[in-house]
Regions:
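Charged docking surfaces used in two-component/phosphorelay signaling
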Residues: 16-24
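Receiver (REC) domain active-site loop signature in two-component systems and cognate sites
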Residues: 56
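C-terminal output helix
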Residues: 105-114
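Active-site beta3 strand of CheY-like receiver
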Residues: 45-51
């Protein structure tokens, strides 16, 4: 079974790069540029992993994560930001993020974290 990843970033180039990299690793990936669109999609579609930018114009990643945690506590959620220093790490973890990564992304580190967390969730679930 292919694992499903949802990528949310208002930078469409960034979305495309992440999508292509994870697809090349065998994941099924949907990329969106709007957290509102993602919340709508999540009403009827399930994902194993969500990767979201923190700084988006319509809704920031922290608000998105908090809203999602109310309905999808089991979904792995990772934060990305080119301005990670602007965010309080404890606030991000309290919001429910499973991992926090700075841009430019080291895709190998992100992929390793996701695969490790998916293994852990399979053992627990």
């Amino acid at each position: 079974m292919r694992r499903k990843i949802l990528v949310i970033d208002d930078n469409t180039t960034q979305c495309k790069v992440i999508k292509e990299l994870f697809e090349s690793c065998g994941y099924s990936v949907v990329a969106l540029d709007s957290p509102e669109e993602a919340l709508y999609l999540l009403e009827w579609k399930e994902f194993d992993v969500i990767i979201t930018d923190l700084s988006m114009p319509w809704m920031n990643g922290v608000e998105f994560c908090r809203r999602l945690r109310n309905t999808r506590p089991e979904t792995l959620i990772y934060a990305l930001s080119g301005y990670i220093y602007k965010f309080d790490r404890n606030e991000l973890l309290e919001a429910g993020f499973d991992g926090i990564f700075s841009k430019p992304i080291r895709i190998d580190l992100l992929k390793d974290a996701i695969e490790e967390d998916l293994k852990k969730s399979r053992m627990v679930g």
